[in-house]
């Protein structure tokens, strides 16, 4: 493992890139009882046009897929929800989506390896059906409408719309009610297969760990996959100048 050390802040990190492409960063800290892990994929709201590495298929997806996929990852085929399972263990777990990445995380003082089992199980084994995807559209649709009534969020989105003509940063992370209506299990599976590959992901672990030992624990739980290489993302070329001087939105 490669060691990176900062004498100024007295911190060190060990970095290892596995054969399947996954980057693992381990930050040993023996001064705290807390243990923390975050597993992220470089897939966010701006990634709506790409070429699948293994098939060279050019894919366009509806706005909001990265966020939709984050919501669906916790649901298991046996009817359980991994977020509930982690909380029942006393583990504080969460997930989030941004413009350029999605991440799954938890922190705990106890039962870290039980949490690691659950995290690495649900992130590597998605469960999509016509029924559960349709159900999620209603849930996320309510979330979108909630943000439509949030003045701060609307101010932020309207500013982006004024600043940019084509840049994907303008896309609302959750998409729109119309765009998520076009999401299907097939769309989710294509995006999962492309962006949730280890070669497009980073895992960071912090706590009182021996770096070599925790790295082996991660390796034992990884499904065997070959490094797929870099994903070709296609973005709109932004034009010079602002899009408009101001926006008006009245409800």
Describe each region flagged by the PLM.
Residues 1-81, 189-251:
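His/Glu-rich zincin catalytic helix
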Residues 2, 77-191:
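Acidic/histidine-enriched segments that form metal/cofactor-coordinating
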